[in-house]
């Protein structure tokens, strides 16, 4: 059971670990452009190197958990700008109401989540909560049927995601991890959700 009415069929979270991995980022963004067109999905960024800087420097800077949490989410916003630039037909969105507008215009919405999460503040402020748990919460909030985590390797999402993830993933949301070496799995995972316009 998800939290709200269905806004998208699938939430696709693109992990920052794909950056700099032998063309993985290029393959994944190309696949999203090809497979995502005309399908009711939302792309959610990982924190990538932007959030990793916060993690690495938070102790040195002597910032508290709340500050680090919001700075890391701002890192997700930065990665969202990269994805919106690199995924063909993507549109950067910041709030739930922007998503159906982008979809209606034939665009692939990429969420910069800071404003939405700052208003809702749904998750603990801890490094046990990463973009995986944020994507899981968003899947529930949007009534999505599927959550797809794009990561360097495939496997059990509970083992590959952050410690809070099992609590963040709503019942009834099917979760799958897809790796860049099997992007046909992404097409299959999105296949039930809407038309494919190529």
Go through each PLM region and give its residues.
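Nucleotide/pyrophosphate-binding catalytic subdomain
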Residues: 1-193
